[in-house]
Design a protein with these regions (language model features):
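Non-heme Fe(II)/2-oxoglutarate
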Residues: 1-87
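Catalytic core of non-heme Fe(II) oxygenases with the double-stranded beta-helix
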Residues: 68-191
Length: 191
């Protein structure tokens, strides 16, 4: 796997392909599945606002095996392109994530999995609800330090078609949108 610190690619997804993805995951016509925790492995009553919705593309229990659904078939070429850019051997997980209008909620900081990996975000729609990558690398845990004093490595605004690749050991999080109904992204984990 290529050593990746942090890379941001604007207009990574071509306009017509992006439009097809947006149409395929439009919440007014596509079923989304409730997730009690967007950020953490286990649901926590104390973090009741850390909810969102998802659509599985490639589940973590079957690396490199995409679901046999129309939306997974549509997104698969994009994920293979990302895999090639990252020079990754495996796609460990891929899902669509949607957070909804909220009053400036910052989700809990986290890393996605315990093994060394590259994390990838592709924003599907223009929205607010920045992604925050802290200048702090850590190992996977159920809880993380208070980020109040951690320096921010990068703050990235959700822009349709923008792709962010980063070392998955960076502690990171995101905001729910407070000025748009939805913030939709494709979240992929590679090794």
């Amino acid at each position: 796997m290529r050593k990746i610190d942090l890379a941001i690619y604007d207009d990574f997804v071509s306009p017509s392909y992006l439009e097809a993805i947006q149409s395929a995951c439009d919440p007014s016509s596509t079923p989304w599945y409730f997730q009690g925790s967007q950020s953490l492995t286990d649901y926590d009553d104390a973090l009741i606002e850390d909810f969102g919705f998802s659509i599985g593309i490639l589940p973590p229990w079957q690396p490199d095996q995409f679901d046999d659904t129309p939306i997974a078939t549509l997104i698969k070429p994009l994920i293979y392109r990302i895999k090639d850019i990252a020079k990754a051997d495996h796609i460990l997980r891929c899902r669509l994530d949607m957070t909804v209008l909220h009053d400036r909620y910052l989700h809990p900081p986290h890393i996605d999995i315990g093994q060394p990996h590259v994390a990838c975000i592709v924003y599907v729609n223009d929205s607010d609800g920045d992604t925050v990558i802290y200048d702090h690398k850590t190992k996977w845990a159920k809880e993380y330090c208070d980020t109040g004093n951690l320096p921010i490595r990068e703050r990235i605004a959700p822009k349709a078609g923008r792709m962010v690749l980063f070392d998955g050991n960076y502690l990171h999080t995101g905001y729910s949108p407070s000025e748009h109904q939805t913030r939709i992204l494709i979240n992929t984990v590679l090794s």
